[in-house]
Amino acid sequence: MASILRTALLGLLLFTTAQAQFQFFEQMFGGGQQHQESSGQGGNVPSDSAWYQNTYNGAQCSNYLCPGTLACVAVPHHCPCAHPKVEEKFELGEGSAICASKGGFKAGETARKIELARKGLL
């Protein structure tokens, strides 16, 4: 009787341990799809451009409205970068400017690399 009880307890212990491990793997691999589906319903901006168009059309600006940041500036090359913490603004000299990723370079390194690329040296 004691050996049957011991075998039953050991079997139950092994079953619950295996079930816990499989639930872990299900969450890691199969459960991720359920998480993605449920997170798609909460507060995400729709993939169409209607929100941007409405905001752009509703903005009041007597000079130039920057398309990337919706900032109102005097001339197009004065538009700020959308992500100034990670982008560096570089004026091209022809009345236009670009924002390029800093990429962890030291200050001014992005501008130097852009100039080298414009000259065909990079």
UniProtKB/Swiss-Prot annotation:
Keywords: Signal
GO biological process, one term: ERAD pathway
Family: Belongs to the LCL2 family.
Signal peptide, first to last residue: 1-20
Organism the protein comes from: Arthroderma gypseum (strain ATCC MYA-4604 / CBS 118893)
Functional summary from the UniProt entry: Probable component of the endoplasmic reticulum-associated degradation (ERAD) pathway.
InterPro entries: LCL2 (IPR034543)
The protein's name: Long chronological lifespan protein 2
